[in-house]
A protein has these predicted regions:
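Mature extracytoplasmic or organellar-lumen-exposed domains after removal of signal/transit peptides
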Residues: 1-181
Length: 181
């Protein structure tokens, strides 16, 4: 009976992580569709995909907890490092992108930071644990925005490519290729 329970649990682990992988692939596709066509409908589909993928990931929390009981100290540390990259909370929203009183804040608006995976990994927690640039909650902030009142979600228009500079940007000597697109 115990072996049957253990084997059943191992099967459940496989099932749960397969579900996470599947939901993440669907979410990645929705992100791609949104970036190709940044409209409200594609943004809503992407938001729905984030909710499904994140919920699926949260269902694996128990497996990570139990794995700590059987893994070496080194493997547990690796697991914590991965968890920090995947699902760290809380994050510092202004480190990632603009917030209400600081429209130009965040690494998204920092013209000295190249927005690619390598740079984002380097920026992740560089000065403080809350300065996350990776993971579900960073994506959540980028998708919904600050939205403190739960009624003013980030608009899809934030993701439309910039094709001309504002007068302030021109006065500051910026070039179009320096603007986040």
């Amino acid at each position: 009976p115990i072996r049957t329970i253990m084997m059943g649990y191992l099967d459940q682990i496989d099932t749960d992580y397969d579900a996470v992988a599947s939901e993440l692939m669907a979410f990645e596709s929705q992100v791609g569709q949104f970036l190709e066509n940044p409209e409200t409908s594609s943004m809503n589909a992407m938001r729905s995909g984030w909710l499904t993928a994140q919920s699926s990931y949260e269902l694996t929390t128990l497996h990570r907890y139990f794995s700590e009981l059987v893994l070496s100290e080194e493997d547990v540390l690796t697991l914590f490092q991965l968890q920090y990259q995947i699902n760290h909370w809380p994050i510092l929203p202004g480190y990632v992108d603009y917030v209400a009183d600081y429209q130009d804040s965040g690494i998204v608006n920092d013209i000295t930071v190249i927005l690619d995976l390598e740079s984002l990994r380097q920026e992740h927690g560089v000065f403080d644990l809350a300065e996350a640039s990776l993971g579900f909650h960073v994506l959540e902030f980028l998708i919904w925005g600050e939205n403190k009142d739960r009624q003013s979600e980030r608009p899809a228009s934030d993701y439309r490519a910039v094709s001309e500079l504002t007068n302030i940007q021109i006065d500051n000597g910026l070039q179009l290729d320096q603007i986040s697109n």
